[in-house]
Amino acid sequence: MADKAMAATPNKGGIMRYGVGHGSTTDSLDSGTFENSMMTNTGMTFGNHLMEIGSDGQLRPELAESYESSDAKTWIFNLRQGVEFHNGKTLTSEDVVATFDYHRNEDSKSAARGLLTAVTSIKADGPNRVIMELNAPNAGFPYIVSDYHLLIKPSMDGKIDSQSGIGTGGYVLQDFEPGVRATFKRNANYWKEGAAHFDEVEMISLLDTAARQSAVMNGDVDAIDRVDPKTVALLARVPTLEILEVAGTLHYTMPMRVTSEPFDNLDLRLALKHSIKRQELVDKILLGHGSLGNDHPISTANPFHASGLPQREFNPELAMKHYKASGHSGTIQLSASDAAFAGAVDAAQLVAASAKEVGIDIEVVREPSDGYWSNVWNKKGWCTCYWGGRPTEDWMYSSAYVDDTEWN
């Protein structure tokens, strides 16, 4: 959202107040732990990456001024010179090596570790050049190094302080209260032209959808994310607000932990998948602001979307066939919270209702928003979730679906 009165050409000055629909008291400045938009936005406000994805969806250099590879296996990144961290330290190749080593070492708990398993070595070749060796060719590797976890931080004696809020970004972190807010002031020495226009930025965690939308309608914040489809038409009638809607790779999911009972049973999983009225979710939860998913994370925005796969449909007979084959009986719990996405609890209720038509009993457990990503997601057997998606198919699968990534 943006005030229509603001000119299209940016002017320097002012304070940007952003109401974010995520945030938790368990949040940390360790970029390896970033798991919600409050923290990814925080990190990208005070930091930079080797590469970045532009607003047009295209890959472009950021702290790496250029990159090259003759075989897609050995990648050379030439660093931008004259860049300073907020503590005054000049960016060098040692900072890049230390940052990547932090995320890829065998004891790392970083969510980016799975992305870097193909990296066999990283070394500095002078102060402004980094060489990365892969175990196999990967033409999409420059996309991987733009991952929001791989925020470049200053090093000392080959190590980074993962908990520091020091970066090379357009704004200097002033204050950080996990699950509450983060405040920033413009970096007077920012290297990137045409960026960082505000004097100050304040990000406020507003988990409640109604409170978040009231805040932007009342002028308490200047912009919000995660607009509820149910009330988007109401917001559109406010003359000072503009609704920005784009197609992308964001998708809503209800993942099952297949290593825990009863979801380790394939027949049970198939029974549940055929018990869902997917079009009903698009119509009643997204109100048309979305499209059908088909149990894989590659959207129509990706070039290799599998459009030929038969769409899974609500099929009571097939669902019951698999349910009987599973041997399961009793209630199945589905944990839900609007922390996952606006309408997640209602979506879970619709899933439970359609499953009841089949003869499967689902209990919707309404979970608190605070701490959801630390205490429920990846902990409970079945829950509501969302993924921002990734620009490439390999990146998406490497982030969440390989067996040694922190998020699988």
Where is each model-derived feature located?
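N-terminal lobe/hinge region of extracytoplasmic solute-binding protein
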Residues: G19-D71, D101, I166-T168
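Periplasmic-binding protein-like
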Residues: T231-L234, T259, F263-N302, G343-A347
